Amino acid sequence: MGDLIFIGSVFCALISAYILLFKKNIVHLFSDRILAFLFLCYSYCTIGYLLISSGWLIYFPFLYRTSAPVNYLIPPLAYLYVKSVLNNKNKWQWVDALHLIPFILIFINYIPLFTMSIENKNAIVKMVIDNYTNNYNIKDGYLTENIQFLRPIQSLIYILLQWRLIYTFEKNNKSEIFQEHTAIVLTWLKKFTIAITFTILTFLIFVIGVIYSLSTKQNINDIVFYSSIPVAISLFYLSSYLIINSNVFLGLPYFDYDKNNIKVEVLDKAKYEAEIEAIENLISHEKPYLKQGFSINE
C-alpha cells in the first residue's frame, strides 16, 4: 500500500514541478523554482526507497545511496521556499549557501561508495535488500552509518524555523490589501508546513524503531514498511494539493513586507477618501459642469 501511494505521490510531484518550472509567472519565479526543486528532491529520494523496497535496486546498483545527500537538501529547501514567499525574495544570497553544508558533507562522506566497483556495490545491495538492517550496519563511507541520525535533528531545526517564519509574518503584517488572496497563500504555506511536520514526526517514530531494533538485533523490515505509509500519504497530499489548488501558484502580492508595508503606496484609504470628498464638494458647490466648454480634462 505504501509503495502505491509513493508512486502516486512521485507522479503528482513531477507534474507539480513541471508546472512550477514552466508556467509564465515571472514575478514569483524564484520561489516557484525552489518548490519545484524540492519536489524533484522528494521524488528522487522516494524512487531510491522504492528501488530498495521492491528489490529492483539490484538492477541499478550504481544508484545505491545517491539519494542520501539529497535528503539533506529537503529541509532547507522547504524553509527557503516559505521564506521566499513571505519575504518576496527574488534571488539567491551568498548566505543561502550555508544551507548546502550538510549536503556537501554527506556527499563527501560517501565518495568511497560512489567510486566503488559495480561488483562490490552489487554485493552490498543484495545484503541490504535481504535485510534492511544492513543499511545501518554496513559502513559505506568514511563515517559509520550513525551519521544518518543527523537527518531528524536537521529536520527538527528547520521545521521550527519554518513555523517561526509563518508566526512572525502573521504577527507583523496586518495589511488589509489583497487580504483574501494573502489568506489563500498563507493557508497553503500552513498546510505545506503541517504536512512536512507530520512527515518529520513519523520519521522520528521510524528512527526510534530503528534504534530499538538495532539494540535488540531484530529485523527492521516491518518498521520500514509501516512507517513509510504516513510519509507517502504526506508527500501525496503536498504534491496533489498544488495541482488541485493552482491559485496558490500566484504567490503573495509583491509588497516589501520586510519594511512592514511602510513604503507601500496602494490606495491609501485616508488619502483616497479625502480626494473623493474634494471631488464631491467641487461638483456640488462650484458646479463646473454648467460652464460652457467644460471638459473632463479640467
What do the PLM-derived regions correspond to, one by one?
Residues 240-298:
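Membrane-proximal linker segments that couple transmembrane helices to downstream signaling/catalytic modules
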Residues 87-116, 126-127, 182-195:
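The cytoplasmic-loop to transmembrane-helix boundary for the fourth helix
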Residues 52-87, 147-159:
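Alpha-helical transmembrane segments and their immediate interhelical/interface regions
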Residues 25-44, 142-210, 221-230:
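Alpha-helical transmembrane segments of multi-pass integral membrane proteins
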Residues 26, 44-67, 204-219:
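Helix-loop junctions on the outward
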Residues 1, 18-28, 54, 58:
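Short, hydrophobic transmembrane alpha-helix segments
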Residues 1-13, 148-152:
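Hydrophobic transmembrane alpha-helical segments in integral membrane proteins
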Residues 122-138:
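Membrane-interfacial helical/loop segments at transmembrane boundaries in membrane proteins
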